Design a protein with these regions (language model features):
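Positively charged, low-complexity/disordered segments
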Residues: 1-9
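Extended alpha-helical targeting/anchoring segments
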Residues: 8, 13-407
Length: 407
């Protein structure tokens, strides 16, 4: 577990959740009016496997991706582009753990940093490389098609005997990294714009993503979760697209699965909300993306301040839409059936602001670039009447947007 602080890194292995909670809770101060809420923030990811520090989940899956379970950044210098206000903010933070002996000198240093930052931004150019389109991308999975089909059938047996109602099974796709990770992110912004777009450039790997789904959000003292469950591919024509939309909304299997996960989302929000404040503000609406469409609902509740921000995040972690129901047993089955630890996939990505708010999304439609490899993981929700072949195809369709960003 890695925590980055003002130019240094700290590896945490012993009960990391306690230290992370303390770091987040201690990171509080009033942001000056007129500045964005993210003018001072802690940002990064919590891998799916973070839950192993919280719950007693089996540890059979091998860790072959070799990235930290949690990686958080507390940036000192930020450039924030506010698309709504059409403004760019240049910000330098001073943290209370910095030892300052000469404040006038520090002030002049910050002014110099801001001046350099402004000058650099004026000189900045788009350095996207014009690489040739690949005629074919060779993709392999850590799970064969037959193995995935047998995983689905095994999960259905667990459902039949009453262990679970639903479980999300996934496979990890791997291909050669043929572009600079930042160029992939730039293309993804064009080809698959999503509510959450992110690019993290760590020293030894990069995370690139376009997630459609909130994990947990705290804003204006409101807790929000937004479950997404139920999928169809996008049509090649408007007529076909409309057909898929209608077909999705009348599919009893998809509707019952979504209702179950909506109830789970209400329960998660209720854990950290004031009594009798949780309500569904949107239910069973269709949201469309570049390669797939989904059924989406929205749940909000009044934040109960007796819970810390980190515990509020954990109330919905991992999301039921990427684990299953009941969560603990579903995660045990995931560990039994899947070949590798999920790591970044199905975890949480986002930020905690110094003003007490936070916003996180589920690490879906998310890739990890490491050395010369490009990894994309995708899953499908398995219920009693799941058709194994269709569930396999759903994972392939979900991964396409990221894979195609390499073209």
């Amino acid at each position: 577990i890695v925590q980055s602080l003002v130019g240094s890194e700290m590896c945490i292995r012993d009960r990391p959740q306690i230290l992370i909670e303390n770091i987040i809770e201690d990171f509080k101060f009033k942001i000056p009016s007129g500045l964005p809420s993210i003018a001072s923030l802690i940002s990064g990811y919590f891998s799916y496997d973070t839950i192993r520090y919280i719950e007693n989940i089996p540890n059979k899956c091998k860790d072959d991706l070799k990235v930290p379970d949690v990686r958080l950044l507390r940036p000192r210098i930020l450039v924030i582009h506010d698309n709504l206000k059409k403004k760019i903010f240049y910000i330098v933070n001073i943290f209370k753990d910095e030892k300052i002996s000469n404040y006038p000198k520090k002030y002049l240093g910050i002014k110099s940093d801001l001046s350099k930052l402004f000058t650099q931004s004026l000189k900045a150019k788009d350095k996207t490389t014009n690489e040739k389109k690949l005629a074919k991308i060779n993709v392999k999975s850590n799970t064969s098609k037959n193995k995935f089909l047998s995983m689905v059938n095994k999960a259905k047996k667990y459902i039949k005997i009453g262990d679970i109602f639903q479980v999300v099974l996934s496979q990890r796709f791997e291909t050669k990294l043929t572009k600079k990770p930042l160029d992939i992110y730039k293309k993804l912004r064009i080809t698959n714009p999503s509510p959450f777009m992110f690019f993290f450039n760590f020293n030894d790997f990069q995370i690139i993503g376009a997630s459609p789904e909130i994990l947990v959000r705290l804003r204006d003292n409101k807790i929000t979760v937004r479950p997404i469950a139920g999928t169809r591919p996008r049509g090649k024509t408007m007529t076909q697209d409309k057909f898929y939309e209608k077909d999705l909304l009348k599919d009893k299997k998809e509707l019952s699965e979504h209702l179950m996960l909506l109830d789970l989302g209400r329960n998660d929000a209720g854990k950290v909300s004031k009594v009798n404040t949780v309500k569904v503000t949107e239910s069973f609406v269709i949201e469309k993306y570049s390669h797939v469409m989904h059924i989406v609902s929205n749940v909000i509740g009044d934040y109960n301040k007796k819970f810390s921000k980190f515990k509020s995040l954990l109330a919905g972690f991992p999301a039921g839409t990427v684990s299953g129901a009941p969560k603990i047993r579903a995660m045990e089955i995931i560990d039994e059936l899947e070949k590798s630890r999920r790591k970044v996939y199905a975890g949480g990505i986002g930020y905690f602001s110094a003003n007490g708010e936070f916003d996180t999304c589920i690490a879906l439609r998310t890739a990890v670039a490491k050395k010369d490899k490009f990894y994309v993981q995708a899953g499908a929700g398995i219920v009693a009447d799941s058709v194994p072949k269709k569930e396999y195809e759903e994972t392939v369709n979900k991964a396409k947007a990221l894979i195609n960003a390499l073209r």
